[in-house]
């Protein structure tokens, strides 16, 4: 979105040191929000919005994904396209979900190693992003229990459409798709930021764990980002960030929501 608006500065550096505009006022309708999520950020989709119908874009996305799955990039990356499409469809239809390899394997009737192998291939081919849990020790950070996002939110809305699901009718799916959309705006910009941080999510263990959707880490400094699809923000929406702020490395935390104004919850929230 910032590239389309002609902003060359990375949002990642602004999250670290930028001064928020506390006088900001603005609003976005649910229809416009869903439209932006559906279009995503890839230039071939976003830049052709006026020339391409929704159905044409859907066919183009499906064709692009099929082409990526049909390429053998490395000798050991042979894949069965039937298995690949089945696994990818399940992952894309649950944006922001934490990967449960055993559950997915049971649902699709494949073994765990097959699921893990295909998820690894999808990440290398830039179809999905797998965020590890920051709370896990570095030597235990595997694909299992990663948080899965499409590399572009248009992939998810297309998968949901194929599954007969509609963001307009499912607030939970809208929340997950918005989370992926926001993360799609931030993670690519880490590559041209001054900080170039590593990306994680953060989640406590236990029955009712606190969680933060995206954590950026660089030089023992943390930035936390939580995403909410609601138009009103509550103090408890900052609970995950508050818990994360107990980490000595914490610098700032942000809640991205769909309301019309900036709200300061605390000096660093």
Which residues make up each language-model segment?
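Conserved AAA+ ATPase "SRH/arginine-finger" region at the nucleotide-binding site
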Residues: 1-2
